[in-house]
Regions:
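Secreted, cysteine-rich disulfide-bonded mini-domains of extracellular proteins
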Residues: 22-131
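Sec-dependent bacterial lipoprotein signal peptides
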Residues: 1-18
Length: 131
């Protein structure tokens, strides 16, 4: 009798977790599905149709630089002023796991609230890759 109840509880828990997610059914935000935030070794590793570049961060970072506002970034990412003086489209996140779908453990991005969004988005966090 305990096994069916346990299975039912697990099924309900997974349905609840899926219902709380703001990601689309096939997983990830539009920006993640486009390749934003992925690790890379060179420009050829990033999807060319979006003009993503392999940015110079540890492990590389498929992204866009020189954005001026969130409107310059794919949905699910935001324009962030980085400490190096450049603006980048970084993924928006809730937790660190949101940042590292396509990154190796030795080059994980951090989900940080200590960033400056060009559009002044307070209360949000962004995936900041390691320098």
């Amino acid at each position: 009798m305990k096994a069916p109840k346990l299975l039912l509880a697990l099924a309900l828990a997974s349905l609840s977790a899926a219902a709380c997610s703001d990601d689309d059914d096939d997983g990830g935000s539009p920006a993640q599905r486009m390749g934003v935030g992925a690790a890379c070794d060179g420009g050829d590793d990033c999807p060319a149709d979006l003009t993503l570049q392999c940015l110079d961060f540890k492990g590389g970072y498929c992204g866009l630089e020189d954005c001026a506002a969130d409107a310059d970034c794919p949905r699910g990412s935001a324009c962030v002023e980085h400490e190096d003086g450049q603006n980048y489209c970084f993924l928006i996140c809730r937790d660190k796991v949101d940042c590292n779908w396509t990154r190796p453990a030795d080059a994980e991005s951090n989900c940080s609230a200590n960033v400056t969004f060009t559009d002044g988005n307070s209360g949000f966090k962004a995936c900041v890759p390691p320098s």
